[in-house]
């Protein structure tokens, strides 16, 4: 049947498809296209199937697209929207053969994601959740699709409410990376906090990427990263009184998922790395810990969490 009960026949020139594009450091670009521009209009014979399928393969669920989609009837001012609560391969699809339009989504299938699962008699399988909403325009929220997105994101409010008291509001965080280019020190932290003392600031985040670059290809091995941790802790200790005086909480930024090509872990502990087709998955100068490998988790627990606790 028709996805919009407000239109007759093929709902010509009034169905809009909303998706959200994404890539590294440029997440969240809303893309709106008409059903006609996506060639989601029926043929004269009503037998040819047309579909627009999109999604992501792997463990970065917002690479390419957000797991979100919406159809808007612009004449009626109504939006049907869906979001997947998913952190693995997923797909969504707008499908049309006749006057009706179907909107589906979930785990990536055999065609799109090279994945399938056989459920034997007596077995069960639980899929990730999908959050659905339908709404009309709302003056307070602006456009209809904005209001639909607001309704979808409010689904997670219950998880926010269950968080610690310190996370019941959105803290104002300052990342000093572009101020010191990853080489924080007691002196420049003092200068930063002096410069923002008239502002409300909750967290100052230290990024030691500059020191990381000096030993870059080996630093991410987390044995040599010990020195980065010690360096960061030393800066924090030196600046502790300044943080306390201005009631600002310090934080340290680390990326623990990869190793550099000159680190001994890169070549000596391939058993901890992600593999594909029997070989270690390797990019230009990095390899990646297999976060499903208990030995990799134990290694990181010791080298990162253990050293931070010290």
Predicted feature descriptions by range:
Residues 1-97, 113-115:
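Polysaccharide-binding surfaces and accessory modules of carbohydrate-active proteins
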Residues 12, 213-267, 274:
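Acidic/aromatic-lined carbohydrate-recognition and catalytic surfaces
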Residues 166-171, 178-185, 252, 256-309:
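Active-site-adjacent "subsite" loops/lids of carbohydrate-active enzymes
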């Amino acid at each position: 049947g028709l996805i919009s009960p407000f239109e007759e026949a093929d709902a010509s020139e009034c169905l809009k498809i909303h998706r959200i594009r994404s890539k590294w450091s440029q997440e969240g670009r809303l893309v709106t296209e008409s059903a006609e521009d996506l060639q989601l209009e029926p043929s004269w014979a009503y037998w040819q199937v047309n579909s627009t399928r999109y999604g992501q393969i792997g463990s970065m669920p917002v690479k390419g697209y957000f797991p979100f989609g919406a159809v808007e009837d612009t004449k009626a001012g109504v939006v049907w929207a869906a979001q997947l609560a998913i952190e693995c391969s997923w797909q969504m699809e707008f499908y049309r053969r006749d006057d009706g339009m179907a909107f589906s989504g979930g785990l990536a299938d055999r065609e799109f994601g090279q994945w399938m699962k056989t459920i034997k008699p007596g077995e069960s399988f639980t899929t990730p959740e999908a959050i659905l909403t339908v709404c009309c325009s709302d003056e307070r929220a602006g456009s209809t699709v904005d209001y639909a997105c607001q309704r979808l994101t409010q689904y997670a409010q219950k998880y926010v409410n269950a968080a610690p008291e310190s996370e019941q509001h959105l803290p104002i965080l300052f990342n000093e990376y572009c101020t010191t280019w990853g080489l924080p020190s007691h002196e420049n932290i003092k200068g930063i906090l002096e410069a923002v003392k008239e502002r409300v600031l909750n967290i100052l985040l230290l990024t030691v990427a500059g020191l990381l670059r000096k030993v870059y290809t080996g630093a991410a091995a987390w044995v040599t990263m010990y020195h980065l941790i010690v360096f960061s802790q030393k800066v924090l200790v030196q600046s502790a009184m300044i943080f306390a005086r201005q009631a600002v909480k310090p934080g340290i930024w680390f990326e623990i998922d990869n190793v550099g090509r000159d680190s001994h872990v890169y070549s000596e502990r391939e058993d901890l790395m992600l593999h594909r087709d029997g070989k270690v998955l390797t990019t230009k100068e990095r390899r990646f810990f297999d976060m499903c490998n208990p030995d990799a988790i134990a290694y990181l627990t010791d080298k990162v969490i253990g050293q931070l606790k010290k």
